[in-house]
Amino acid sequence: MIDRYKHQQLRIGSVSPQQISAWAKKILPNGEIIGEVTKPYTFHYKTNKPEKDGLFCERIFGPIKSGICACGNYRVIGNDKEDPKFCEQCGVEFVDSRIRRYQMGYIKLACPVTHVWYLKRLPSYIANLLDKPLKELEGLVYCDFSFARPIAKKPTFLRLRGSFEYEIQSWKYSIPLFFTTQGFDAFRNREISTGAGAIREQLADLDLPIIIDYSLVEWKELGEERPTVNEWEDRKVGRRKDFLVRRMELAKHFIRTNIEPEWMVLCLLPVLPPELRPIIQIDGGKLMSSDINELYRRVIYRNNTLIDLLTTSRSTPGELVMCQEKLVQEAVDTLFDNGIRGQPMRDGHNKVYKSFSDIIEGKEGRFRETLLGKRVDYSGRSVIVVGPSLSLHRCGLPREIAIELFQTFVIRGLIRQHFASNIGVAKSKIREKEPVVWEILQDVMQGHPVLLNRAPTLHRLGIQAFQPILVEGHAICLHPLVCKGFNADFDGDQMAVHVPLSLEAQAEARLLMFSHTNLLSPAIGDPISVPTQDMLIGLYVLTSGNRRGICANRYNPCNYRNYQNERIDDNKYKYTKTQEKEPFFCNSYDAIGAYRQKRIHLDSPLWLRWRLDQRVITSREAPIEVHYQSLGTYHEIYGHLLIVRSIKKEILCIYLRTTVGHISLYREIEEAIQGFFRACSYGT
């Protein structure tokens, strides 16, 4: 639908019978009103043409071929001449055949029918509004019992009988036996009410503002009651309060959306456009039909039978009429939700029919498969793997995916740089994977962000922008810090990649959707790019090292290491003074270089020369040992620190006892802080 602000939107909810009729009815130029489907037929078995007033009628839903009526006459669509725009013989309009994708029909039901989604789905909206048990309402809907009409002025058969009960379940089988169809209708219209008509009457009599006021008063009264000793009674009161809250919210929703409660009971049943429930001819002349067509036929058959009972057969017992109304109700229930009342309806091959609910809901439903998750151009999909060397705003695209996504841009680059004379030559170079193709692809990707999306997209961080780079393999590489926003992990999850084409989309991706600009949760404001899972384990391994102090390492042989930096077996170890000391390094580059040359391990303790830091110098920790040298200098040895002083007690240098893992982590943090300050200074 399109609102007054020209915004296209989709609204799902209850509609009035007048709206259903407006969707389906058409007035032909000769004044004839069409739109009602009255026959359960589809195509004629001889001519293979749609049956008139059937489920595929061309008068109701439009022509199968554009501009050609059922008689075979042809008119030019959009011609402004005074030629008639419909065939006077068959009544088919000369319009585009695409009208069969959205033109609806309707079935006029012989009796009211409740919408099973509002009755049987939990919570039951009808039971909530009427404040009645669901089992009691089901008995009314399926004609298991009736209730007396509240007629105060006129004397009725039930009043003379002295029955003031609400339900007359004991008369379910006795009352209809005394009447024929005509007599039973008169009796039912005066004395009792049953079926969906009884529900419709009660819903129509509701005053929603009064329901809200009464529910609020009762909720306050229950809230003022003190807890009792009986736990069961307290739970009962709590459930009643929750029910009243739901009832008030539902009534407010009906008022806010201008929906009448009686619309939950159907008098007109919409018929889907035929293109949404097609019949397809396959090899061998066989036909494949949508299950919806068979369910519609079932409804029409039973509805026509009920019409015949009410109009022609005046000697039919009333019990048979009630039974047929129940069959119509069950047929409509099966159309909306097959199996909601128990055993589902099956075809001759014992296959369950797919109803509206089966077509709409679920991963393979209409919304998730063809509207939300449909395939689009300039998109791809692959498994995600961790890319720990990537920046936060980058992602790795496999070469095969990247060349397909950016193929048009690469073709334009090849032609502009005179590597190809036309599109055909450019495509051949791409198929042959010439080196110049990858160079141009690199240039194209540098200035073009991509969007990564992981279904289901439940919040705005489910789709983010990244700067792509080429990687080997067939998987998309992703920084582990952005996984929490996507609710993704690396156990086989798949993600879709999209290319924003327009300049507006690219600007939006860069300014609003880049991953490094979405570090906080939009819901609560907490950081969402935090280390989890593998990153925490990696940080632990990186910084675990040997946490014992220098004394423990000196006197505890269990933590001593030999010159090859390997663990020593406790049983075979013997302490000797010939073992090498822990190595000294002048800077972090030398320490990391020694690790890469495999001269030390990641958690090997070492001494690293450090700059003069006032926080280290002013430490109040007492030295463990002091070593004096022959030239007058001396070394103050602390738990994780060594200070070299001169004769005048001036600090010459400082050594920190650390590991390669700690050095690597410190360098990463330092580079990140420096990059942040450079970005801030550049921005100012």
UniProtKB/Swiss-Prot annotation:
The organism's place on the tree of life at top rank: Eukaryota
Keyword Transcription in annotation: yes
Catalytic activity, EC: 2.7.7.6
InterPro entries tied to this protein: DNA-dir_RpoC_beta_prime, RNA_pol_asu, RNA_pol_N, RNA_pol_Rpb1_1, RNA_pol_Rpb1_3_sf, RNA_pol_Rpb1_clamp_domain, RNApol_RpoC1
Residue pairs linked by disulfide bridges in the UniProt entry: none
Pfam family, one: RNA_pol_Rpb1_2
Record-stated family: Belongs to the RNA polymerase beta' chain family. RpoC1 subfamily.
Oligomer and partners: In plastids the minimal PEP RNA polymerase catalytic core is composed of four subunits: alpha, beta, beta', and beta''. When a (nuclear-encoded) sigma factor is associated with the core the holoenzyme is formed, which can initiate transcription.
An example Gene Ontology molecular-function term: DNA-directed RNA polymerase activity
Predominant localisation class: plastid
Protein name: DNA-directed RNA polymerase subunit beta'
